[in-house]
């Protein structure tokens, strides 16, 4: 049997003996960096305290912050570290552009202008907070744009329904956060917009890779304010790419 759950739910099931620790042979912590950055550290530690000592543990993470390494030191016995070489992280097939936005509050107008210009099959818009997901969703709907939204504060059933609608094509625009970026596998996604640049260069690949999956071509457009210029530079250096300014003939992309 395989049990999949959030740290809080898994800990609760272990505590109530709905999951018997002595029967568990393997524990996998996926998206460890995101889990830790979202405040699940205490719950993850509580789970490890209830697990039997001789258990196989796998920790998967796009990045290796100190908090993730601390888990390997505290709870793993002679762990083997497997790293993916940076040259295996590819953005091939994805056209990447940026748009200079002088002020944060002008991003919304820029986004609406793009949607009036581009011919889009399906697209994903990334922001950095759950609150901003809700805010941008309300603003877009207020301008008669049909959009869906998903983030970690929604219950799993609601998120599943939204993703089914998006995969089926009945919903064409999805607004979300980094936490869910790595689980979006939709073949028809042709455009990713970083309304907010990611806070870490490593997450850029997980975001814009949504538009180039399954060998398809894709486009990513990054909104860049003055405060974002350093991160844009870091992203280009990290992936050894040049991100061009969005051309005037944007409709031809």
Swiss-Prot record:
Does this UniProt record's set of keywords contain rRNA-binding?
Answer: no
Q: Which residues form a coiled coil?
A: none
Q: List the Gene Ontology MF annotations in alphabetical order.
A: ATP binding; ATP hydrolysis activity; RNA binding; RNA helicase activity; translation initiation factor activity
The record, for SMART domains, names: HELICc
List its EC numbers: 3.6.4.13
Where the record places motif DEAD box is: 30-33
* Database matches in Pfam families: DEAD, Helicase_C
- Family stated for the protein in its record: Belongs to the DEAD box helicase family. eIF4A subfamily.
* Subunit structure and binding partners: eIF4F is a multi-subunit complex, the composition of which varies with external and internal environmental conditions. It is composed of at least EIF4A, EIF4E and EIF4G.
User: What role does it play?
Assistant: ATP-dependent RNA helicase which is a subunit of the eIF4F complex involved in cap recognition and is required for mRNA binding to ribosome. In the current model of translation initiation, eIF4A unwinds RNA secondary structures in the 5'-UTR of mRNAs which is necessary to allow efficient binding of the small ribosomal subunit, and subsequent scanning for the initiator codon.
**What's the protein here called?**
Eukaryotic initiation factor 4A-6
């Amino acid at each position: 049997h395989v049990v999949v759950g959030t740290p809080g739910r898994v800990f609760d099931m272990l505590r109530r003996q709905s999951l018997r620790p002595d029967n568990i042979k393997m524990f996998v912590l996926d998206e460890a960096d995101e889990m830790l950055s979202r405040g699940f550290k205490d719950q993850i530690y509580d789970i490890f305290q209830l697990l039997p000592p001789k258990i196989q543990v796998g920790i998967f993470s796009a990045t290796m912050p100190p908090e993730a390494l601390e888990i390997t030191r505290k709870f793993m016995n002679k762990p083997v570290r497997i790293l993916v070489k940076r040259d295996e992280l590819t953005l091939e097939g994805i056209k990447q552009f940026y748009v200079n936005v002088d002020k944060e509050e002008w991003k919304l107008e820029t986004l609406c202008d793009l949607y009036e210009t581009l011919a889009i099959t399906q697209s994903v818009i990334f922001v950095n907070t759950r609150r901003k997901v809700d805010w941008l969703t309300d603003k877009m709907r207020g301008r008669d744009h049909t959009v869906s939204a998903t983030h970690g504060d929604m219950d799993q059933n609601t998120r599943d329904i939204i993703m089914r609608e998006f995969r089926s094509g009945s919903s064409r625009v999805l607004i979300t956060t980094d936490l869910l970026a790595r689980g979006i596998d939709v073949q028809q996604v042709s455009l990713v917009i970083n309304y907010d640049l990611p806070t870490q260069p490593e997450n850029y690949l997980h975001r814009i890779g949504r538009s180039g999956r399954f060998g398809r071509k894709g486009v990513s457009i990054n909104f860049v304010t003055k405060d974002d210029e350093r991160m844009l530079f870091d992203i280009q250096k990290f992936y050894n790419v040049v991100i061009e300014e969005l051309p005037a003939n944007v409709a031809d992309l």
